Swiss-Prot record:
Species, as recorded: Xenopus tropicalis
Catalysed reaction equations from the record: L-arginyl-[protein] + 2 S-adenosyl-L-methionine = N(omega),N(omega)'-dimethyl-L-arginyl-[protein] + 2 S-adenosyl-L-homocysteine + 2 H(+)
Alphabetized UniProt keyword annotations: Methyltransferase, Mitochondrion, Transferase, Transit peptide
GO BP of this protein: mitochondrial respiratory chain complex I assembly; peptidyl-arginine methylation, to symmetrical-dimethyl arginine
UniProt gene name: ndufaf7
Protein name (database record): Protein arginine methyltransferase NDUFAF7, mitochondrial
Transit sequence range: 1-31
């Protein structure tokens, strides 16, 4: 049996360090309430004033204001995850999700020849649950990783979420440290003993052999919406409804879109496309870093291969929400165009996927891991929660088909003499 196969088989036999690691995500904490009507009106008034001053704004500018406005932005002051928030993510449902991603990282670290240092970088870490689960796996494989210098780097713009992450990962609050000579605004030591730093921008994360984890990160980046007309591509903008002065509406821009000229291909068959320049900048950065220093990026998100058109939508209290209604009180998202990502990466690195979440987790051995956890627990409530989390992660009408996994690896990684990348090939047990 190969070292990789032994690692993956061993992973399925891991026993949780404590009972509180056993899929009790819904009970972990309650999220805060939504902004009240006064807060929502404040952001709407800000947007209306901006439009009156400078004219209609792009969907990209609207998303940036609604999600990350320093005063009233949706992400800036809210814990929106979990049963009582606006959406639930895979790590909040089941510890197995994060454990398997941790095994994936170790598998790729071994395939790379066990480098002496490893940076775990998560983009948009949410409540810190996924990183926490990953680090627990690293600790469980402490003997294997003993000679590796591991550090954690979190890219987070939300003060509220960074506070929650710090509490979860280190067990205590960490004050913001503003140093003009350093891009790090928080730092500490995790409960598992690894140094952790927080950054506002991916560009500030140190170079080195790194695993970049982006779970439901790219779908929240601002998009431009473009419409094909007889006169060329026009950008869809957001303006004030002339009939209802406190309401916003979509309008078609009057001029040829510069964004379209840059990012839309001449043979684009769709009449409506969504383009994310921010995603292009980030994925290109990751590809260059990975090919130069080693490591990989693992991206999990809603997505497609360039066939979908209008995917811009809002979520509030687990239900679809009008994207232009009460800005700042709902999450805004758009599906990731993985074909666009592949095109941007180009020859800088190699891409794998997308494959469905069901396929990826199946290939990583989720069924075996579930069986082990069920056998190890005599608590009926824990067993039910394990099965409930598994079903949501895997079922086609839940997350199993909707979420996709996509990876960027060094060009050298796909040489035929190397073992296949875990998760993107069928699991073979010997």
């Amino acid at each position: 049996m190969s070292g990789l196969a032994r690692l993956r088989k061993t992973a399925f036999l891991m026993v949780s360090a404590s009972a509180n690691c056993r899929i009790q995500r819904y009970q972990s904490s309650r999220t805060e309430k939504h902004q009240d009507s006064t807060s929502a009106n404040a952001l709407l008034n800000h947007l209306i004033f901006k439009i009156k001053s400078t004219g209609p704004i792009t969907v990209s500018e609207y998303m940036r204001e609604v999600l990350t406005n320093p005063v009233k932005g949706y992400y800036m002051h809210h814990d929106m995850l979990g049963e009582h928030g606006d959406f639930v993510t895979s790590p909040e449902l089941s510890q197995i999700f994060g454990e398997l991603l941790g095994v994936w990282c170790i598998s790729e670290w071994m395939s790379a020849g066990k480098p002496k240092s490893l940076q775990l970088v998560e983009l948009g870490p949410g409540r810190g649950t996924l990183t926490d689960d990953l680090l627990r796996v690293f600790s469980n494989f402490g003997r294997l990783l003993n000679s590796c210098d591991i550090s954690v780097h979190l890219v987070e713009v939300s003060p509220k979420l960074s506070d929650i992450q710090a509490q979860r990962l280190t067990g205590k609050a960490i004050e913001v440290e503003l140093d003009k000579n350093s891009p790090v605004y928080k730092k500490g030591i995790t409960k598992t003993g690894f140094p952790v730093c927080w950054y506002q921008d991916i560009q500030d994360v140190p170079t080195g052999f790194s695993f970049y984890i982006a779970h439901e990160f790219f779908d929240a980046l601002p998009i431009h919406k473009l419409q094909k007309t007889k006169d060329g591509w026009r950008e869809i903008l957001i303006d004030i409804d002339p009939g209802i002065p406190d309401k916003l509406r979509f309008v078609l821009g009057p001029n040829v879109s510069l964004v379209a000229n840059t990012f839309v291909q001449d043979d684009e068959p769709r009449d409506h496309v969504e383009v994310c320049p921010s995603a292009a900048v980030i994925i290109q950065k990751l590809a260059n870093q990975i090919n130069s220093y080693g490591g990989a990026a693992l991206i999990a998100d809603y997505g497609h291969m360039g066939e979908r058109t209008d995917t811009f939508r809002g979520f509030r209290a687990h239900k679809l929400h009008d994207v232009l209604s009460n800005p700042g009180t709902a999450d805004l998202t758009a599906d990731v165009d993985f074909n666009f990502m592949r095109r941007i990466v180009g020859e800088a690195a190699s891409c794998l996927g997308p494959v469905t979440q069901h396929e990826f987790l199946k290939n990583m051995g989720i069924d075996i891991r579930l069986k082990v956890l069920l056998e190890k627990s005599s608590d009926v409530a824990v067993q039910k929660q394990l099965i409930h989390g598994y079903n949501i992660l895997m079922n086609a009408d839940q997350m199993g088909q909707r979420f996709k996994f996509f990876s960027v690896v060094p060009q050298s990684r796909l040489k035929t003499t190397m073992p296949p990348v875990a998760g993107f090939s069928k699991l073979l047990m010997h």
